[in-house]
Structures are given as C-alpha cells and as structure tokens.
Amino acid sequence: MKPDIHPDYQEITVTCSCGSTFQTRSTMGKPLHIEVCSVCHPFYTGKQKIVDTAGRVEKFRQKYGKKVEKQPAAG
C-alpha cells in the first residue's frame, strides 16, 4: 500500500436541527449539520404515519379495471 495517499480521518461533531449532537469520524474535517437524525426521525420515534392506499387502489380499479358484466341467467 502506498504511504500518504489517504485523506486524514478525523473526529467531527454532527449537529441535528432538533439540537441533538454526536461524535463520529470523517474525512470531512469540519462540523456537519443535518436535518434529521435517529432522535427525531419519525421511523425511530414511533410517530410514523401509515398511508392508507386502499382509496387509491379503488380509484385505480374504477378508472382502469375491467367492468364485470352480469351474465344472463341460463334457462
């Protein structure tokens, strides 16, 4: 392996918009500001909204689905 070709790997502070901070290592070399982290992300906090797509599926079927025609009674 060649010496002195890799960038410096330094410890930096990551700050979230919610105010949470943590330390990590990066070649960036300066503090990093992020919008969402594991403290405030809806997936990790349990405040995730589940989108009900049943209405969309029914709307699609009405628009593009095959229409079921009544068959004449045998007799």
Curated annotation (Swiss-Prot):
Organism annotation: Nitrosospira multiformis (strain ATCC 25196 / NCIMB 11849 / C 71)
Membrane-spanning parts: none
Assembly behavior: Part of the 50S ribosomal subunit.
Protein name (Swiss-Prot/TrEMBL): Large ribosomal subunit protein bL31
Gene Ontology CC: ribonucleoprotein complex; ribosome
Keywords: Metal-binding, Ribonucleoprotein, Ribosomal protein, RNA-binding, rRNA-binding, Zinc
Listed cofactors: Zn(2+)
Gene this protein is translated from: rpmE
Keyword Endoplasmic reticulum appears in the UniProt entry: no
GO biological process: translation
Protein's job: Binds the 23S rRNA.
Similarity remark: Belongs to the bacterial ribosomal protein bL31 family. Type A subfamily.
Keyword Metal-binding tagged: yes
InterPro entries for the chain: Ribosomal_bL28/bL31-like_sf, Ribosomal_bL31, Ribosomal_bL31_A, Ribosomal_bL31_sf
Gene Ontology molecular function: metal ion binding; rRNA binding; structural constituent of ribosome
Cofactor note: Binds 1 zinc ion per subunit.
Residues reported to bind Zn(2+): C16, C18, C37, C40
